Amino acid sequence: MFNIKKLTGSILFLFATHAGMAQQTSPVDFVNPLIGTESKYELSNGNTYPAIARPWGMNFWTPQTGNMGDGWVYTYTADKIKGFKQTHQPSPWNNDYGQFSIMPITGTPQFDQEKRASWFSHKAEIAKPYYYSVYLADHDVTTELSPSQRAAIFQFTFPKTDSAYVIIDAFDKGSYIKVIPQENKIIGYSTKNSGGVPENFKNYFVITFDRPFSYKAAVKSGAISKDELEIQDNHAGAVVGFSSLKRGEKVTARIASSFISFEQAELNLKEVKSKTFQQVVDEGKAQWNEILGRVQVEDHNIDRLRTFYSSLYRSTLFPRDFSEIDGTGKRMHYSPYNGQVLPGEMFTDTGFWDTFRSLFPLLNLLYPSMNDRMQEGLVNAYKESGYLPEWASPGHRASMIGNNSASIVADALMTDRKGYDKDLLWEALKHGANSAYPKHSSTGRFGYEYYNKLGYIPADVKVDQNVARSLEYAYNDWCIYEFGKALGKPEAETAIYATRAMNYKNLFDPSTKLMRGKKADGSFVSDFDPSAWSREYTEGNAWHWSFCVFHDPQGLINLMGGNKSFVSMLDTVFVIPSYEGMKSRGMIHEMREMQVMNMGQYAHGNQPIQHMPYLYNYAAEPWKAQYWVRKIMDKLYLPTPDGYCGDEDNGQTSAWYVFSSLGFYPVSPASGEYVIGSPQFDKVTLNLENGKKVNIQAKQQGANQVYVDQLTWNGKPYNHNYIRYKDLLQGAKLDFKMSEAPNKNRGTKKEDAPYSFSNEKIKGK
């Protein structure tokens, strides 16, 4: 996939001025994987861990400060490391699967995670996407690691000792280990998971060392046994030792894993088998620079550069590539849906409820060939399970709501990609829109019978989050309609989805101008508090969800009484005190994150309202979008361990920043348009995959210069509040003239408003 030889001429170097000194560096040097790691159950500042990985890698590696099975695997405030874990965790809420760890120690053999743990300091820690190093003070050992796509190489620098050991922990819930001393090798598997796997699920691993073992033992349920070298148990592990080490001498371990077999794990080991540690490091750095170098940023503020490239790094981790390459060079995958080994693509560990909003549109803009592969993976997921996933980790998970695979599929078609079965995806979309997954309510459409009959899901039929589901289903129906229309499907098939796309109107309450729960008899629920985080909504309230009409803001404006009334409703979101509604239900972390940010009812730490500031563009007051978008970027995104204002969510919250800092955002994925905001950088160059470049300049921008006074496109005045994907694809030069005062004449005409489905229907398209 990646041609390292071509990088010499293609890696883009950035010039950043800091403390009066010019520095020349590469994109990956700005990335801080520790952003967002200062989090806990009660308050998320990202809920991230340092993912040491390749872009979209099958395996990530991370230092482990939490206990075995803890979703908070690494927290910045911790002071001890218990191991270095291979992880596939997309979120602490969904937790991990197939995980195992490795840990160097000195002294006496110790397997217990508390006894083997070591103090560490961030002052003796280096975290980069392609490399991690830390000094383990209690053992006087420096651990270094660098990953490939499916393997990794470790380097342990021990003190002078005859008692150096490496612990391999295959974790509990069913694991296997075998020490093969004649080959300096350990093999094993982990079956630990948090759901979403077939019964035959295993993560097979192989570990080889560069020297013989002076000590070897297997571990059964915590007990070290020198008499056994092979154990299958609830909790298996191994300890191997090395003697006669000189101070500073390095022990190298190479590790690979496979979800298919031990034999495939051996094939995957070839990624690092014949390479030195430095070669793997250099290749990882080059690969990250190729990916991050799709965007070249020039700016005077180094913290913003760190925030940007760290956000782009987070945007290119998930969904992970779950495929493997067999001995003939063919791409295969273990199906997390039916347990079979099958040919072709598979991607996983993403929740479409989060990532349809900006993560996948970002992939379509900057990495369309990668999303092409992801679409083939969706085709395979449908073949293997009968449904498109909504939250995959690695298979179907019971998490969140919506049928937003429709958005993922429809938005990808905007790039006019080829190479996957779009007709089968059409069948998959129709099936998912008219049925419910039998095992849980998060795949397909829970409550579809009511929605299809009444045009909404009633609040009195025991389908929770009914307002949120209904609104998302309406947007999903629009996506299905647009997808079918683009494929040339007959109107007899597509018309029903165009009709259902307007179902959002059925829950609009004219008396409050908000979306409100409605009973089966057509009456609104009586106990309505718009600030209450009630059961009709998903992780939010009426203020958050009433603007979730992504495909038809003009229709929503009409319902609310026109532009002035609509703008007033938007303004109100930022005015109502953040503590309103806090006692409406048991506290969840999203509520606290909104409260402490002190931006009224605007809850950027959660997805439903993230697009809302851009809606001013539809109502002839784009300067308010510019003000709020810039304020959100400046206040809520920092290059620090507490740098997010809620869950990062597999690239979604990061992709919001990436788009917004460029100066535009995909309010309605699959519409082919981006809505203009306030560019944050002096100069940006997008290096599109087709060879074209998009140059964005905003040299007058600053802390106070947040308003767009003028915009030119290829030297000509441009007053619209939107940008079309197809126009960017041709290459473009956008020059923003920024100002401290809003220009209340620019972007105020009806034709300047971005796409709305109501306008499309009026025009008869």
Annotate each language-model stretch with its function.
Residues M1-Q24:
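Bacterial Sec-dependent N-terminal signal peptides
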Residues N476:
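ATP-dependent phospho-/nucleotidyl transfer catalytic cores
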Residues Y707:
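Extracellular attachment/recognition segments
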